[in-house]
A protein has these predicted regions:
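Glycine/proline-enriched, intrinsically flexible loops and inter-domain linkers
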Residues: 1-83, 88-110, 114-474
Length: 474
């Protein structure tokens, strides 16, 4: 394939997955997806290798999908499927680490032959069980666990599955509506891909896939080779549930290879903050890419030079059936450990500590109209500063999840945002200051009782400043 054609096709793939994500968001029933962007979308070759991802999305979804799709391919190889088939799962140990994230995978066919896959992951507004949080002791308490199964078969909806979900979730219309939106996104992506293949007379994706993945791998290895060989370590303390936890990390650079080892980190706990390996891998590779190779496409090829190790049974490689609902309260701190280790060798490329763990606010109750409601939205503290710029205020990193506007919250629920304001001087001082945190005051416009669940961290251990900068506020 000549270089010009390759670049055109690569640009087309990026355009296609961005249209896939846009279609999903436009069709979504929930502010979690269409406003906060808690989703991912990507295209995969016939073997399940991730080729390209949409710009909109979160690392905890897109990087776990790179592994998750292979489980679908193993259980349902392309040659066993037909046009109109589509599959899904929310198994935390196959996907993105908790039951609220549902992955929908759809094969793409050209002239009756399977040529690739489109997949997306979205956060469901509800999945049954306990209210989303860290209070469960086992995953069985956290909601409905759907193994890999058909969502559509030859174009026919799996109504038994839909009936089970409707009977178990608090917001059935929103949950089922988003499944249709996810399917719509994949269908748009597949249609655009096939049109492109026909335009350029391409029979399959094998040649293009090999070029994309091999080039990404080589460029990533070249970027790693620019860092001096050695072992760089760090340790991060976080609140935990009832006692603090430690994340210990060693980053080994050896020529064109990189190994991350979390040996010595705290063991898994009896609360829902445990992290499955897929999620650990996702939030390890993302900050590494930010620091080492930000311009290189994020795909299966760029993952090849990086090995991630976490002992079985530790907080970062938790074993079934432990509870995992609030796994992000630990997993989002991996970027701080990565940057802490790399600050010893490439300090100009990393961020200081920030708030890290995404804030989840969920309210459940009965509205003034007598209807039950369950609503969740996300917020964040500040990002750490870099060596060249202030940290962003009220911005989620590393998740990239957007805060939901007060107007959007109030339009679809009886929740009222009484106050939302930045907290002065909450970011650490320095030549470049840390981003500011925020204060929120909420109310429910109903005389009937409501339940509030909030997930957060950074109440015991302040975010660290780097290169002589001051710590931020806990």
């Amino acid at each position: 394939m000549d270089p010009v054609t390759f670049e055109v096709l690569w640009s087309r793939l990026i355009s296609i997955v961005n249209e896939q994500a846009a279609a999903l968001m436009h069709a979504s029933f929930t502010t979690v997806v269409r406003e906060a962007g808690d989703l991912s979308a990507g295209v995969f070759d016939a073997q399940g290798n991730m080729l390209a991802q949409a710009v909109t999305g979160t690392p905890g979804h897109i990087n776990t999908m790179a592994t998750c799709v292979r489980h679908f391919v193993k259980k349902h190889p392309l040659e066993t499927l037909e046009p109109g088939d589509s599959l899904l799962t929310n198994d935390p140990w196959l996907g993105s680490g908790h039951l609220h994230d549902i992955t929908v995978v759809t094969p793409a066919f050209k002239d009756g032959k399977g040529v690739g896959w489109f997949a997306n992951t979205c956060h469901a507004m509800d999945i049954g069980g306990r209210t989303l949080g860290a209070g469960a002791r086992q995953v069985y308490e956290e909601g409905v666990n759907v193994p890999i199964m058909f969502l559509f078969r030859k174009g026919e909806l799996n109504r038994d599955l839909i009936d089970i979900l409707r009977a178990n979730v608090r917001e059935p219309d929103q949950v089922v509506g988003d499944l249709y939106a996810q399917q719509a996104g994949n269908d748009v992506g597949a249609a655009k891909l096939i049109a492109t293949m026909e335009e350029y007379d391409i029979g399959d994706l094998e040649g293009l896939s090999t070029l994309i993945l091999d080039r990404s791998e080589e460029r990533t290895r070249d970027a790693i080779a620019e860092i001096p060989n050695g072992r760089y370590d760090d340790e991060v303390s976080i609140d935990g549930y009832d006692e603090p936890l430690q994340i210990k990390i060693a980053v080994d650079i050896l020529d064109r290879n990189l190994v991350v080892d979390y040996a010595g980190s705290s063991p898994q706990v009896n609360w829902g903050i445990n992290v499955v390996y897929n999620y650990t891998h996702a939030y390890t590779t993302y900050p590494l890419k930010c620091a080492i190779s930000p311009e290189i496409p994020n795909n299966e090829g760029s993952f090849r030079p990086v090995k991630v190790r976490a002992p079985e049974g530790c907080i970062l490689n938790a074993e079934f059936p432990c509870a995992v609902g609030a796994r992000h309260l630990v997993g989002h701190f991996l970027s701080q450990a990565i940057f802490g280790a790399l600050s010893k060798v490439i300090p100009e490329r990393v961020l200081a500590d920030g708030s890290a763990g995404l804030w989840n606010t969920q309210l459940e109750g009965v509205g003034p109209d007598g209807r039950r409601f369950a609503y969740i939205f996300f917020s964040a503290g500040g990002m750490g500063a870099s060596a060249v710029a202030d940290g962003l205020s009220a911005t989620a990193f590393p998740s990239g999840i957007r805060g939901v506007p007060a107007e959007a919250i109030e339009a679809v629920s009886p929740v009222r945002m009484v106050k939302r304001a930045l907290i002065s001087d909450s970011g650490g001082a320095g030549r470049f200051r840390g981003g500011l945190s925020q204060e929120m005051v909420l109310a429910v416009d109903s005389d009937l009782p409501a339940q509030h669940s909030c997930m957060y961290d950074r109440t015991r251990f302040a975010p660290r400043g780097f290169l002589g900068g001051a710590d931020g506020q806990a």
